[in-house]
């Protein structure tokens, strides 16, 4: 067992044994670290996200064709509503149901994971007695200017003040520490380990306050380990734009929507260097649904591709769209009207926790976002029989069927598997807030057109690894706030967002512990293969890797990138959480047919609206609850 695996075991599994002797340094994080946890998933290290044990029963049905989960044990439990899926949409559905029909209504939420929140995954790293909080999925509250009344009322009711981020987010942090965006070329792919202080793309621009590169593009290209031919071709891409396309100006807008980005690279610009194409393919990461080899020019331009600002190089093609009206072109602030600062330390897990706290008051302390950020939830409270809302984790729903003809049924039977045993409960209604693509496999009598619509959906695989490190001196030395990594599994690495809320304080000095976020939207091996084929390939590959595989990749990545005199993996890395989401972003729209009610069963989840934003998850939950009438 490697050192990091031993540390993971000690920190993740045996924390309770050592909690009483952790050093106290007077911070809110230290007080929290000293609390003895029992069942507390946020501190679990190793493979997280869709962790081992969370998807096996669902995959047996969807991939293996298994339809018989054994005779269920009938429990003497009947609810007004059962919610399948404990992500933000499922939690919001339970919340809205009580708001609509009374807080005395009995609701049970079933989820296949060992924690609630779905993609809104809280990661807590205990680094020498100091709790560092990170996010393992759903990242921020985006598009605030477009929130509807339902969303705003929910946020207000659970204790979220959107104005607090203007002070909580330390936009001057990067300037104070001289941190910007760079690119890391690794030895395994590019022939040598080298960091160039230029991102060559617009992806890092979403991080408010991150310094823009002052290194001229020509000098940056010259510093890369590319061949002479590769450097010439990279420069051609960076200086490209609408001016190289020989068509009338008025036809440009249609052109970029109907022509492939990779066709533009290879045929229009004549790029054939595999390393330049690799850089181009890996720039969008989680901005888009798949790699840039599967997208149109217009889709890629939205993701900050290789090259200068698209609002300059593709000005006539993209026009003066809504985004261009609020982007700031100068300085280090990306957006004026809706800056990307609405981020809790644990991402949108704070929203999930506030919803749980609202419905199960005894789960922990705090009544708003500031107070709850360091609250150590008592998971023993989640499924108490005395609760009007109960959350049952590690429970995979495998069958949902009406007790009679759907149009006049009086209830719904729900079968689920917990600890390899099948149980049955009953409810007056069910909200399916799970991945919509699994619904046809567990609701057996769906109408054919609805079955087909839901089966057509897919998911974009994503991965977000959080690394607890004792210091970030190496990042400081290289001036890295975010670094693009086109040769690695994780395509970008960044310091956690500089947010301090309540008694939680963000790292102040490079000598302090912090979390490194390593991002990945893995791609298939074949350039240009259809996106869905690539998703499937990546999904199997992702789930086939062990923690040792991920640890070795992370070890090689960080050790090759950071200065050896300032970073030693075994000494400085305290903990690793690999949040694998083999089923990540929504892909495909089920339409009205797919999301329509079916008897006493209604459908929520952001999948129902073909978007992965939290406001969509909440909006679809609201609709699904209204349809329960």
What are these regions (language model features)?
Residues 93-95, 118-125, 441-445, 478-479, ...:
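Short, solvent-exposed loop/turn and secondary-structure capping segments
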Residues 80-92, 111-113, 397, 429-436, ...:
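Conserved beta-strand->loop/alpha-helix structural units within folded catalytic cores of enzymes
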Residues 225-395, 405-409:
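Active-site/ligand-binding neighborhood in enzyme catalytic cores
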Residues 39, 67-255:
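N-terminal glycine-rich phosphate/pyrophosphate-binding loop and immediately adjacent elements
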Residues 34-70, 124, 188-189, 193-194, ...:
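Conserved flavin/dinucleotide-binding core of flavoenzymes
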């Amino acid at each position: 067992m490697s050192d990091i695996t031993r540390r993971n075991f000690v920190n993740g599994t045996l924390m309770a044994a050592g909690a009483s002797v952790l050093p106290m340094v007077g911070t809110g994080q230290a007080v929290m670290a000293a609390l003895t946890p029992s069942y507390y998933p946020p501190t679990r290290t190793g493979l997280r996200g869709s962790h081992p044990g969370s998807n096996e029963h669902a995959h047996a049905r969807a991939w293996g064709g298994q339809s018989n989960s054994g005779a269920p044990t009938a429990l003497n439990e009947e609810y007004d509503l059962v919610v399948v899926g404990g992500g933000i949409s499922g939690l919001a559905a339970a919340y809205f149901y009580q708001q609509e029909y009374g807080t005395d209504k009995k609701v049970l939420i079933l989820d296949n994971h060992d924690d609630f929140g779905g993609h809104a995954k809280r990661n807590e790293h205990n680094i020498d007695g100091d709790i560092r909080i990170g996010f393992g999925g759903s990242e921020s509250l985006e598009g605030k200017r477009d929130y509807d009344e339902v969303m705003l009322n929910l946020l207000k009711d659970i204790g979220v003040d959107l104005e607090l981020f203007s002070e909580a987010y330390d936009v001057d942090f990067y300037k104070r520490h001289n941190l910007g965006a760079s690119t890391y070329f690794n030895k395994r792919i590019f022939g040598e380990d080298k960091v160039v202080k230029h991102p060559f793309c617009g992806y890092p621009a979403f991080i408010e306050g991150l310094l823009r590169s002052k290194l001229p593009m020509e000098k940056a290209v010259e510093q890369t380990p590319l061949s002479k031919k590769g450097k010439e071709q990279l420069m051609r891409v960076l200086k490209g734009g609408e001016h190289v396309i020989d068509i009338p100006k008025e036809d440009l807008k249609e052109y970029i929507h109907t022509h492939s980005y990779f066709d533009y690279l290879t045929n229009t610009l004549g790029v054939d260097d595999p390393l330049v194409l690799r850089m181009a393919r890996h720039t969008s990461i989680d901005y888009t649904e798949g790699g840039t080899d599967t997208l149109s020019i217009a889709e890629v331009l939205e993701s900050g591709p290789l090259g200068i600002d698209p609002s300059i190089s593709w000005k006539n093609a993209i026009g003066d769209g809504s985004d261009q009206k609020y982007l700031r072109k100068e300085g280090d602030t990306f957006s004026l009207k809706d800056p990307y600062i609405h981020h809790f330390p644990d991402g949108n897990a704070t929203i999930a926790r506030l919803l749980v706290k609202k419905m199960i008051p005894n789960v922990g302390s705090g009544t708003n976002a500031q107070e709850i950020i360091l609250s150590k939830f008592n998971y023993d409270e989640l499924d108490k029989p005395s609760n009007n809302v109960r959350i049952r984790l590690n429970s995979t729903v495998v069958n949902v069927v009406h007790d009679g003809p759907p149009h006049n049924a009086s209830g719904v039977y729900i079968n689920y598997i917990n600890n390899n045993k099948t149980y049955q409960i009953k409810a007056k209604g069910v909200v399916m807030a799970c991945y919509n693509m699994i619904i046809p496999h567990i609701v057996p009598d769906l109408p054919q057109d609805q079955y087909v619509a839901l089966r057509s959906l897919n998911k974009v695989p994503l991965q977000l690894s959080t690394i607890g490190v004792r210091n970030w001196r190496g990042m400081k030395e290289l001036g890295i706030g975010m670094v693009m990594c086109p040769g690695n599994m994780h395509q970008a690495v960044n310091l956690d967002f500089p947010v301090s809320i309540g008694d939680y304080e963000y790292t102040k000095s490079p000598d302090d512990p912090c979390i490194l976020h390593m991002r990945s939207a893995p791609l298939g091996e074949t350039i240009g293969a259809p996106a869905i084929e690539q998703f499937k390939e990546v999904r199997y590959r992702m789930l086939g890797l062990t923690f040792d595989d991920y640890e070795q990749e992370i070890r090689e990545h960080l050790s090759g990138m950071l200065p050896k005199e300032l970073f030693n993996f075994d000494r400085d890395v305290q903990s690793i959480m690999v949040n694998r989401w083999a089923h990540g972003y929504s892909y495909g729209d089920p339409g009205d047919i797919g999301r329509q009610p079916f008897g006493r069963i209604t459908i929520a989840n952001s999948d129902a609206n073909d978007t992965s934003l939290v406001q969509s998850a909440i909006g679809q939950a609201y609709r699904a609850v209204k349809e329960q009438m």
